[in-house]
Structures are given as C-alpha cells and as structure tokens.
Amino acid sequence: MYQLQFINLVYDTTKLTHLEQTNINLFIGNWSNHQLQKSICIRHGDDTSHNQYHILFIDTAHQRIKFSSFDNEEIIYILDYDDTQHILMQTSSKQGIGTSRPIVYERLV
C-alpha cells in the first residue's frame, strides 16, 4: 500500500518575483517513488486547514525550495528539481543537525 502525503504550499503570490513563482510551479503536481511506495501531491493553496506548509527559502539558481509545516516547524523539507520528470526531497532539522538522504520522485501523468 502506498503512503500518500499532501503538501499545500501557502504563500502570497504578490510578494514573489515571477522567477520565484516559476520555480515553485516546477514542483506542483503528483509525484511517486514506486520502490518506496510513497506518493506526494504538491499544490498551492490555503483552501484547507490540513497539511499546510510555508516556504522558507526559494533558490532560483539551483531550482530548490525549502519549506516547513505550520504544525511542526522543527522539520524542514527541501525539494530539488532534477528534470521535468523527477524531483528530489529530503528532510532536515531546523537546527541543521542531520539531513536525510534525498528521495527521488517521478512525476505521475
């Protein structure tokens, strides 16, 4: 059975540059790692009170975003854009102690 994680990125588009918005949009969609049986659904919006995450940092040069949950700000998630079909996701602590190995996700069509 697949583990499914919903990530609702909450941000104010009026405070972001066009390049930052484009960078975020690279990650929007449904992604899966078949080997680990994990799927993630990344979207923009605050139309739900569940699974809300706020963006901490947008690195447009490396196509990377860092974000954390409204419920647990101690865990930081890092998304790296690999290509149109793959992203990498890893976690870290807010204190920077330890970082998980990146998990590769493939875009679901």
Swiss-Prot record:
Region annotation Binds to staphopain B: where it falls in the sequence: 97-101
Positions of disulphide bridges: none
Function, in words: Specifically inhibits the cysteine protease staphopain B (SspB) by blocking the active site of the enzyme. Probably required to protect cytoplasmic proteins from being degraded by prematurely activated/folded prostaphopain B. Also involved in growth capacity, viability and bacterial morphology.
Compartment(s) where it occurs, according to its Swiss-Prot or TrEMBL record: Cytoplasm
Family statement: Belongs to the protease inhibitor I57 (SspC) family.
Pfam families reported for this sequence: Staphostatin_B
Further comment: Inactivated by staphylococcal serine protease (SspA).
Single GO MF annotation: cysteine-type endopeptidase inhibitor activity
Record protein name field: Staphostatin B
Subunit note: Forms a stable non-covalent complex with prematurely activated/folded SspB.
InterPro entries reported for this sequence: Protease_inh_b-brl_dom, Staphostatin_A/B, Staphostatin_B
Alphabetic keyword roster: Cytoplasm, Protease inhibitor, Thiol protease inhibitor, Virulence
Gene Ontology CC: cytoplasm
